[in-house]
Amino acid sequence: RLFGSNKLNIHQERTGSKFEPVASDANNLDGLNIHCGIVDELHAHKTRDVWEVLETATGARLQSLIFAITTAGFNKEGICYEQRDYAIKVLKNFDNPDPLSIKDDSYFALIYT
């Protein structure tokens, strides 16, 4: 068997890798050391605290990945709108660089409208 599972996670014993849900409260996430963080429904996060903890938790990794899956939501002051705004600037640079665009080859964005 390549993977094992239990009620807490899916894991690969040979490498010590695991996929498991973690708290949505940033105060309970200190000490993480992750390769990948997945945030579901980013628009529902009232602050950017969880996002910042995940960014910090990937700091020791050369090819870390953080991504969000979300619907738009309504909060134009939150982390979701901030990421959306950044994504649009990166996407604008893809085929037609302009002064309002950002070149960031480390950022992938896909927006369905």
Enumerate the language-model features and the residues they cover.
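Substrate-engagement module of ASCE P-loop NTPases
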Residues: 55-66
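Active-site beta-strand termini and strand-to-loop segments that position acidic
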Residues: 11-14
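Non-catalytic nucleic-acid-binding interfaces of large nucleic-acid enzymes and RNP effectors
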Residues: 5-8
